Amino acid sequence: MIRAALALAALVAFRGAFAAEGGLELLVARYADAAAAEQDVSRAAALRASMKADGSWGDIDYSDKSRSEWPVGAHVRARLRILAADWRRNGSRESLEAAHRALGFWLKHRFNNPNWWWNIIGVPMSLGDAGVMMDGELTDAERRGIIELMTVEEPGHAKTGQNFAWMSENRLRRGMLARDEALVRSALKDVLREVRMGEREGIRSDWCFHQHGEQPQFGNYGLSFLVSQSRLAALLAGTGFEYPPEKLELVRRLASEGYSWICWKGMMDVSAMGRQLHRDTQRTKAANVERAFENLEKTGWVRPAPRFGFRYFDKSAYAVYRAQGFMASVRASTPRITGTETWINEDNAKGMCMADGALMTYATGREYENVFPLWDDWRMIPGVTAYLGKPVVRKDSRNRRDDIRAGSAGDGGAFEFTFEREGLVAHKKWTFSPDGIACEGSGISASDGAYEVVTCVEHALAAPNAGVVERKDGVSRFRNGAFVYTVHAPKDAVSFELAEREGNFNTFMLAHEPTPVKGRVFSLRILHGKSPADAAYRYEITPAK
């Protein structure tokens, strides 16, 4: 979704261009060049070689109905656009001929997906890009077919936030193909409509971005929004058609006050990513944040110095602490603020506990890189107190309590809240300082006696130095990478494991191919027993000396 927004970089100061430099035709040409520049045309020859005579590819199952990563969508989203780009950039007649066949196959069959996003945003976006790149070579029938597929009914629930911005960009593409100047002007105006403070969705007053209600979406819809708006702002800077100052300031502050906190050493915080737990997604999302920052710098924005200290996002039940050698985050939810999305378009099918007091801790940034398939129990999220082994379920994952207290003090800060769901109650508190994190829990009780209650101290990739520092009754110390974990509990109440595990992304991201993933995991837990009453815990996570 983020990549699709990058085509917006072709926009120019269109009013001035229309009047002085050839009008709409110039806009179409510049847009086509920018869209072509985004594609990896080195793949074009292989795509031509593997294409069947009817314009299809044998390795795509055209009956597939996966809602998230839809393999059929790759026909237009990747392959058709690559062929069209090879024609636009390199003048390859072979790729142009193949693009005509690929386009014809799609227009003949008009594949649909049960997820409205593909039909109304994703496919029209890709067809529009390909059509503009092939513009001078399109037949009248091809042009009509693309425009018809792009003229789709927009569901009312989609007309907010980044969904609305995507649809506005599609109207821009349609206007260029139809040579409809009024539609182009209207679409560009609509792109800016969502650059505003939102009461429930969009840019919130804590400088997080929400979508699907009061739900933090830093890494999904919010990142698409930041990328597309920053690129457009950069392109229009200095043209006489700049962003209105108040709109540009909102985009800049979203970057400065929000996104500048959530990445560490080229990796996005797991708790900021949202439901899209794809392979390498921490790295790719952080790279897109960096690209957005570079675009904003072209508008005169001054990138803030590296952030240090405690930052509480009060509309998002989320906090970040950054010190010289490490970063940590806490993610919670309330009856009002939704936790991490689950089961949306086959994404994050096991993530119901990811906002139950998750504590993610980073020194290298790679502590949780692609660890998700190796989690043997998705209730054992770092920092979370939960039922051990109880199956995760597909239902509302919100906390039943709304008592978060958080704030900074000097060079540190604190976050505490009460978690309650499924008969389990736990009061949890974290105190952050440059010396580390003090973690406390109290009042832990549970009504479901079928499962043991456990607090997960850590569930990360095992570093080469992972192991026991000392273990005795009352206090045990463990090390993993740059951190030492000191647990204050009886020895038999502390569970520690270094384990080689194997898993699959497709067990929680259902559209992933079933490719085995192997790795070594560091797992540390505090055991509270079954049906605890007023149980407690205490541990510290400190930088290793």
Which residues make up each language-model segment?
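Aromatic-lined, polymer-binding surfaces characteristic
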Residues: 29, 45-280
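Intrinsically disordered, low-complexity regulatory segments of eukaryotic
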Residues: 35, 178, 539
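N-terminal export leaders
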Residues: 1-3
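Bacterial N-terminal signal peptides
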Residues: 5-15
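Extended polysaccharide-engagement surfaces of secreted carbohydrate-active enzymes
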Residues: 232-545
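N-terminal alpha-helical scaffolding segments that mark the starts
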Residues: 23-48
